[in-house]
């Protein structure tokens, strides 16, 4: 297995696009690390995005919404008083993801991108009309969470955040 820790999402997309075999992204790791340790699945390439620019940030977006980085944990979201005030349903949904220990590692983006039918945060994201940013070699594009759920439009080099 090849391990990469890129400095930005453009580099992560480049690594993913040029990788041979299976690729997995690592942010919180609550699912990926379990799969690795139990030998359920070992990807050919593991891309750790925790150190990518913006991966750990919670900030206001230009449209007065919120931008939540791909590696922001549920615990970090719960502790952010302004986010909690503006998006109470989303923060409450994130609080439903696992135990306190899991919330210290689990990410909102991981909960969405894993594609589990039991993803606790997804209904709240849909209700909040949330959008995601998808990164590829061609650049970034923004799409609504609902479209993300209905269509499998990701190219091989795209990374959702």
Q: Model-derived features: where do they sit?
A:
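Single conserved hydrophobic/aromatic residue that forms the stacking wall/gate
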Residues: 151-161
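C-terminal structural segment of proteins
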Residues: 1-153
């Amino acid at each position: 297995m090849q391990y990469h820790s890129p400095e930005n999402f453009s580099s992560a997309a480049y690594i993913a696009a040029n990788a041979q075999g299976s690729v997995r992204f690592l942010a919180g790791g609550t699912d990926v690390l379990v799969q690795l340790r139990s030998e359920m699945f070992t990807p050919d390439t593991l891309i750790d995005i925790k150190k990518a620019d913006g991966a750990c940030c919670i900030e206001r977006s230009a449209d007065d919404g919120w931008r939540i980085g791909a590696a922001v944990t549920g615990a970090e979201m719960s502790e952010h008083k302004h986010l909690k005030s503006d998006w109470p349903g989303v923060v409450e949904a994130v609080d439903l993801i696992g135990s306190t220990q899991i919330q210290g590692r689990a990410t909102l983006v991981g909960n969405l991108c894993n594609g589990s039918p039991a993803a606790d945060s997804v209904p709240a994201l849909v209700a909040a009309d949330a959008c995601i940013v998808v990164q590829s070699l061609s650049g970034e594009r923004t799409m609504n969470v609902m479209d993300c759920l209905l269509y499998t439009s990701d190219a091989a080099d795209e990374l959702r955040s």
